[in-house]
Design a protein with these regions (language model features):
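Short, Lys/Arg-enriched N-terminal segments with co-localized hydrophobic residues
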Residues: 1-4
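A structural signal for multi-pass alpha-helical bundles of membrane permease subunits
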Residues: 6-290
Length: 290
């Protein structure tokens, strides 16, 4: 009995210790978000005083604090009512990200179905080529894409940002893994009933792969929402910049606006993660399959 009590104590001890460590790590990760949310309810002068030193008659005094002493909605009112440029950047990011997600899901489903369920010459070579392209840093493709879009007259167009995302190879790789896990017996049974490949894809494969496709949606949206290099390289008009670029261009005279825009920028990703967190974890598992 003594040994059992010792074992139970050790298990409880390590369990409590692991929870404490996870709590500390979670707080470290969430600390910038907490600063940003609290800072969005501060005025400009309070932000400067809170995150820096103020000079008084007695010398340099640090007035650092997180909770607003004089909470205000002025930053939010300025964003929503005073200057529409801030919200315009938000909707530009939404438009680009949604277009990329829809296009990538469509392309990935058709391509993944072909790679997963068709046998053709050099199939493995094509799949390995997809993996190689997926491993290339985005910076490597910027110059070739710029030259192509310049020839097509798409520079300073949203298409120059959307098209590379739509034809990204990560979605093809992920969906190929998802479709490969579906038994071929379902496809053979559908063929016996007279279904063509399009019907098989739409009525059997995709309904059986909702979790994998949902994971692609959230991973693709997050990647598109946070992209910086492509808009900087392909879009020249400042007014067309998405939120990710716009946030880095807000100067220190509008720190209250910067905090508010930062809060707005994390809302779509937070909502997606809230509803599709299980699908995202499943997608990571699929991406690690061999």
């Amino acid at each position: 009995e003594m040994l059992n009590m010792i074992k139970k104590f050790k298990k409880s001890y390590f369990k409590i210790l692991s929870y404490i460590i996870l709590l500390i790590l979670s707080l470290i990760v969430l600390l910038p978000v907490i600063f940003m949310v609290c800072g969005s309810f501060m005025g400009k002068s309070e932000i400067l005083n809170s995150y820096g030193n103020t000079i008084s008659s007695s010398g340099s005094e640090n007035y650092f604090h997180i909770i607003p002493e004089q909470a205000t909605l002025k930053g939010y009112l300025d964003v929503f009512l005073l200057d529409p440029a801030y919200l315009m950047k938000f909707w530009v990011s939404i438009m680009i990200s949604v277009a990329i997600v829809i296009g990538q899901v469509v392309i990935s489903c058709f391509s993944g179905y072909g790679l997963a369920k068709f046998n053709f010459p050099f199939k493995n070579v094509v799949f390995y080529f997809v993996i190689i392209l997926m491993m290339l840093p985005v910076q490597v493709t910027l110059v070739p894409n710029y030259l192509i879009f310049n020839k097509l007259g798409l520079i300073n167009s949203y298409l120059s940002v959307i098209l590379p995302g739509v034809f990204g190879t990560f979605g093809v790789f992920l969906i190929t893994q998802v479709f490969s896990s579906i038994p071929n017996d379902l496809i053979e049974a559908a063929k016996i009933d007279g279904a063509n490949h399009f019907q098989i894809l739409m009525k059997i494969i995709i309904p059986c792969s909702k979790t994998g496709i949902a994971s692609l949606v959230i991973l693709s949206f997050i990647d598109s929402w946070n992209m910086i290099e492509q808009p900087l390289a392909f879009i020249k008009d400042y007014l067309k910049y998405p939120m990710s670029i716009f946030l880095s261009r807000i100067n220190e005279t509008r720190l209250d606006i910067a905090f508010v825009c930062g809060v707005l920028a994390i809302i779509p990703v937070f909502i997606l993660f809230l509803f599709l967190k299980d699908a995202m974890i499943k997608g990571v598992e699929y991406s690690n399959m061999k």
